[in-house]
Amino acid sequence: MANIQFRPLHDRVVVRRVESENKTAGGIIIPDTAKEKPQEGEIIAVGNGALDDNGKRVPLEVKTGDRILFGKWSGTEVKINGEDLLIMKESDIMGILG
Protein backbone atom coordinates (compact mmCIF):
# COMPACT_ATOMS: atom_id res chain seq x y z
CA MET A 1 0.00 0.00 0.00
CA ALA A 2 1.49 3.31 -1.07
CA ASN A 3 1.64 6.15 1.42
CA ILE A 4 -0.42 9.02 0.01
CA GLN A 5 0.28 12.64 0.87
CA PHE A 6 -3.37 13.63 1.23
CA ARG A 7 -5.56 13.92 4.32
CA PRO A 8 -9.31 14.21 3.76
CA LEU A 9 -11.24 16.73 5.82
CA HIS A 10 -14.08 16.17 8.28
CA ASP A 11 -16.02 12.92 7.70
CA ARG A 12 -14.49 12.10 4.32
CA VAL A 13 -12.43 9.02 3.50
CA VAL A 14 -10.12 8.06 0.62
CA VAL A 15 -10.90 4.64 -0.88
CA ARG A 16 -8.94 2.40 -3.25
CA ARG A 17 -11.26 0.16 -5.26
CA VAL A 18 -10.68 -3.58 -4.87
CA GLU A 19 -10.70 -5.22 -8.29
CA SER A 20 -13.09 -8.08 -8.93
CA GLU A 21 -12.26 -11.46 -10.44
CA ASN A 22 -11.53 -11.68 -14.18
CA LYS A 23 -13.23 -15.08 -14.38
CA THR A 24 -16.70 -16.35 -13.46
CA ALA A 25 -17.21 -19.46 -11.30
CA GLY A 26 -17.80 -21.40 -14.54
CA GLY A 27 -14.43 -20.32 -15.96
CA ILE A 28 -15.67 -17.65 -18.40
CA ILE A 29 -13.20 -14.76 -18.72
CA ILE A 30 -14.84 -11.35 -18.38
CA PRO A 31 -13.31 -8.66 -20.64
CA ASP A 32 -12.51 -5.27 -19.09
CA THR A 33 -15.16 -3.58 -21.23
CA ALA A 34 -17.92 -5.76 -19.73
CA LYS A 35 -16.86 -5.30 -16.11
CA GLU A 36 -18.68 -2.98 -13.75
CA LYS A 37 -16.60 -0.86 -11.42
CA PRO A 38 -16.31 -2.65 -8.10
CA GLN A 39 -18.34 -1.38 -5.16
CA GLU A 40 -15.83 -2.73 -2.69
CA GLY A 41 -12.73 -0.94 -1.53
CA GLU A 42 -10.06 -0.40 1.08
CA ILE A 43 -9.86 2.79 3.11
CA ILE A 44 -6.41 4.34 2.77
CA ALA A 45 -6.98 7.68 4.57
CA VAL A 46 -9.63 9.12 6.92
CA GLY A 47 -10.55 12.61 8.07
CA ASN A 48 -10.71 13.73 11.70
CA GLY A 49 -14.52 13.55 11.86
CA ALA A 50 -17.37 16.01 11.49
CA LEU A 51 -18.41 18.57 14.10
CA ASP A 52 -21.78 18.12 15.79
CA ASP A 53 -24.19 20.96 16.65
CA ASN A 54 -22.25 21.71 19.85
CA GLY A 55 -18.90 21.96 18.03
CA LYS A 56 -17.71 18.62 19.39
CA ARG A 57 -15.80 16.39 16.96
CA VAL A 58 -17.54 13.09 16.14
CA PRO A 59 -14.91 10.46 15.24
CA LEU A 60 -15.41 8.18 12.24
CA GLU A 61 -16.42 4.54 12.71
CA VAL A 62 -14.12 3.40 9.89
CA LYS A 63 -10.33 3.38 9.97
CA THR A 64 -7.44 3.03 7.54
CA GLY A 65 -7.22 -0.55 6.25
CA ASP A 66 -10.94 -1.36 6.58
CA ARG A 67 -12.53 -3.20 3.62
CA ILE A 68 -15.86 -1.57 2.83
CA LEU A 69 -18.90 -1.75 0.56
CA PHE A 70 -20.28 1.45 -0.93
CA GLY A 71 -23.05 2.51 -3.31
CA LYS A 72 -22.65 2.38 -7.08
CA TRP A 73 -22.66 6.18 -7.45
CA SER A 74 -20.83 7.00 -4.20
CA GLY A 75 -17.83 9.27 -4.01
CA THR A 76 -15.84 11.47 -6.34
CA GLU A 77 -13.16 9.92 -8.53
CA VAL A 78 -9.75 11.57 -8.15
CA LYS A 79 -6.18 10.82 -9.19
CA ILE A 80 -3.60 11.14 -6.40
CA ASN A 81 0.06 10.29 -7.09
CA GLY A 82 -1.04 8.70 -10.39
CA GLU A 83 -3.49 6.33 -8.68
CA ASP A 84 -7.26 6.35 -9.30
CA LEU A 85 -9.03 6.73 -5.95
CA LEU A 86 -12.42 7.74 -4.55
CA ILE A 87 -13.17 10.40 -1.95
CA MET A 88 -16.50 9.91 -0.19
CA LYS A 89 -18.31 10.79 3.00
CA GLU A 90 -18.58 8.16 5.70
CA SER A 91 -22.36 8.18 5.22
CA ASP A 92 -21.85 6.82 1.65
CA ILE A 93 -20.35 3.64 3.13
CA MET A 94 -22.85 0.80 3.50
CA GLY A 95 -20.75 -1.42 5.75
CA ILE A 96 -17.40 -2.85 6.77
CA LEU A 97 -16.40 -6.33 5.54
CA GLY A 98 -14.84 -8.87 7.85
Swiss-Prot record:
One of the protein's GO biological processes: chaperone cofactor-dependent protein refolding
Xref: InterPro entries: Chaperonin_GroES (IPR020818), Chaperonin_GroES_sf (IPR037124), Chaprnonin_Cpn10_CS (IPR018369), GroES-like_sf (IPR011032)
One cellular component term from this protein's GO annotations in UniProt: cytoplasm
Domain of life: Bacteria
Pfam families: Cpn10 (PF00166)
CDD domains: cpn10 (cd00320)
Compartments where found: Cytoplasm
Family, similarity comment: Belongs to the GroES chaperonin family.
Protein name in UniProt: Co-chaperonin GroES
Source species of the chain: Bartonella quintana (strain Toulouse) (Rochalimaea quintana)
